[in-house]
A protein has these predicted regions:
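Extreme N-terminus nucleophile/cap motif
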Residues: 5-67, 77, 176-185
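Short, charged, surface-exposed loops that flank catalytic or proteolytic processing sites
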Residues: 136-145
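Short acidic (Asp/Glu) patches
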Residues: 55-67, 79-100
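Conserved catalytic micro-motifs used in adenylation/nucleotidyl-transfer and phosphoryl/amide-
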Residues: 40, 93-112, 149-185
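Short helix/loop capping segments that flank catalytic or ligand/cofactor-binding pockets
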Residues: 50, 87-89, 114-116, 170-171
């Protein structure tokens, strides 16, 4: 049974631009408030997105710290800790998720514009990717009207994307960024 405090907590995303770091204390805080799985995404030396997902706090902190140490000067780093609201607590529902071969995404909030999985196993984020995002053209992230549209349909949720798509202008994007907070960044 969730405590009253947990009822108001949503997943947490940290997207650190090149040159910025998330420290161990922040990683621990992220996990402690969102202990239902964690994931990391970064762009390696071959310009390939690499992801890592775990259900273990110490593993998350150790891998995230090593990844940040090695890649923070060359890649934005996307970190996500989940608190389950839809779907089972498992690696398959742990963010970030592949949107296509060049893009991953993490989500904060609850997405109401998709049907719930009838079996209760698939998260709202996975349902949204499978029923909406996979059908958008790969360059939609550079289209302000499309970003606004997606922002409108997800309500107060936030989406953070990391991409190596050569047809996009940037390597990361945030939908509904103005509804979130940048901390020391």
């Amino acid at each position: 049974v969730p405590t009253k405090e947990r009822l108001y907590i949503m997943c947490v995303i940290a997207l650190s631009p090149v040159g910025e770091r998330v420290d161990k204390s922040t990683l621990a805080d992220m996990w402690d408030t969102n202990p239902d799985g964690a994931g990391i995404a970064f762009i390696d030396e071959t310009k390939t997105i690499r992801t890592y997902k775990t259900m273990d706090k110490d593993d998350f902190i150790n891998v995230a710290t090593a990844t940040i140490d090695k890649y923070h000067q060359s890649s934005p780093i996307l970190l996500h800790c989940r608190i389950a609201t839809h779907g089972s607590v498992c690696i398959a529902n742990t963010h970030p998720f592949n949107v296509d071969n060049h893009t991953v995404m993490a989500h904060n909030g609850i997405i109401d514009c998709v049907e719930d999985d009838p079996k209760g196993q698939i998260s709202d984020t996975r349902m949204f990717i499978n029923t909406w995002l996979r059908y958008l053209r790969p360059t939609w992230l550079d289209d302000p009207a499309m970003c606004e549209y997606v922002g409108d349909i997800i309500g107060w949720s936030k989406l953070a994307f990391l991409t190596t798509n050569a047809n996009l202008r940037k390597s990361y994007y945030i939908i509904n960024e103005s509804d979130g907070n940048w901390i020391d960044g």
